[in-house]
Amino acid sequence: MNVADLLASSRHCVVFTGAGISAESGVPTFRGPGGLWERYKPEELATPEAFARDPALVWRWYKWRQEVIYNARPSPGHYAIAELEAMGVVRGVITQNVDGLHQRAGSRLVVELHGSIWRARCVKCGSVYILDKPVEEVPPLCRKCGGLLRPDVVWFGEPLPQEAWRAAVELASVSDVLLVVGTSGVVYPAAYIPRIAKEAGARVVEINVEPSAITPIADVFIQGRAGEVLPRLVEEVKRRLRTRQALTP
């Protein structure tokens, strides 16, 4: 099965991404070797209980993460996905990442299943703030009511945002090709997305540096770095589309 042919023929390709694609931008992963969880215990930082216990500690960690991401650049994989969208091949991106690198690369329709590190939400009045740079004061406070702000991300033990989950399920359900990039496939309910697409009739194509929990249901598994594989795929898809246009009377 040729992946470039699949993409060139696709009417509704959707991309599903995990931490692996951002690791190529220098953003530490949670679960890979050298990932963030090797340096910190997740229960100390990424839970509602941890935030209630020590919001300043949690925010110092998120400020550090914001600084890493702020100084990072989207990877060639991010740019390739945005280019496929600009070509009309990709109709949407579902991501487990909270870094906003897809948007910085130019992707327009991005569903963020786990929230965004570039938003903060007041725990008292619910006001949401868009952040264009790392927070300065720790912990930040709501300008409207003085309440504590928290990162607008999904912590361990919290449900996914309903609106984002509905949008992701809808995209996956109508996809004819699901391109899975850089995810371990072990974080639920996000890991259901490839299965939802598969059951709806989509071809599942996985690009990963090593086999994952998704690999057994993938129609095609391409082993490699997203930043190397995806730009090559973009060029192959372009050639096929040009050939078709040339043959069209």
UniProtKB/Swiss-Prot annotation:
Q: Which domain of life is it from?
A: Archaea
Tell me the GO molecular function terms.
histone deacetylase activity, NAD-dependent; NAD+ binding; protein-malonyllysine demalonylase activity; protein-succinyllysine desuccinylase activity; zinc ion binding
Q: Which reaction does it catalyse?
A: N(6)-acetyl-L-lysyl-[protein] + NAD(+) + H2O = 2''-O-acetyl-ADP-D-ribose + nicotinamide + L-lysyl-[protein]; N(6)-succinyl-L-lysyl-[protein] + NAD(+) + H2O = 2''-O-succinyl-ADP-D-ribose + nicotinamide + L-lysyl-[protein]
Is the Transcription regulation keyword given for this protein?
A: yes
Instruction: Tell me the keywords, alphabetical order.
Output: Cytoplasm, Metal-binding, NAD, Transcription, Transcription regulation, Transferase, Zinc
User: GO CC annotations?
Assistant: cytoplasm
Cysteine pairs forming cystine bridges in this chain are: none
Q: Where does Zn(2+) bind?
A: 122, 125, 142, 145
Q: Which cofactor does it need?
A: Zn(2+)
The family assignment reads: Belongs to the sirtuin family. Class III subfamily.
Q: Which NCBIfam families does the record associate with it?
A: PRK00481.1-3 (NF001753), prot_deacyl_CobB (NF040867)
Protein task? NAD-dependent lysine deacetylase and desuccinylase that specifically removes acetyl and succinyl groups on target proteins. Modulates the activities of several proteins which are inactive in their acylated form. Deacetylates the N-terminal lysine residue of Alba, the major archaeal chromatin protein and that, in turn, increases Alba's DNA binding affinity, thereby repressing transcription.
| Name of the protein described by the UniProt record | NAD-dependent protein deacylase 2
Q: Gene name? A: cobB2
